[in-house]
Amino acid sequence: MELFFREYGEADKPPLIVFHGLLGSSRNWQAAGADLGKYFHVCCLDLRNHGKSPHAFPHSYEAMMEDVFVWMDEHDLDSSHFLGHSMGGKLAMKIACERPERLRSLIVVDIAPKMYPSSHDSEYEAMRQIDLSALPSRTAADRFLLEAVPDWGNRQFLLTNLAKREDGNGFSWIINLDALEENQREIEGSPIGTDHR
């Protein structure tokens, strides 16, 4: 799988690979990536089923880890520093536990290796109820999501996944809702086994 990525900093600096959280993308890390690029060669990846990367089943930590290793091999990286937020933090933990030789250091943001309660059901349902083919604007989508997602900031975050269709007929979600919903328990669960705790 050919993952999309954004890079910052000079290629001769130490590599730092950044993983976004669930429903996020490399776009979320543009400002931080530019700052970290003063010290590292920063590569912010779009993980499978997110951003500009391909859609694929399953959406599991094992599959995401293998995607990352393929990407690293294609870019001649034997090892790297890793920074992961939320779902991306769980992915980084899995790499640290299962393939420590590929890790130089680990930064995990806002997540622990444990099961979390489901928190996206109402958001997924509301996103699916929007008639994207007839949607006139992003503002209309924002109004539609208001009842299910009352927090303005959360709605704007979700709407970063809404893209105008190339043929001009409405919008589409850039995330793979089917894969994310089908693998929700996997995403919410611990990425590592009890032998790594």
Task: Annotate each predicted stretch with a short phrase.
Residues A126-L132, A140-G153, N161-A163:
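Helix-loop "lid/cap" segments that line or gate small-molecule binding pockets
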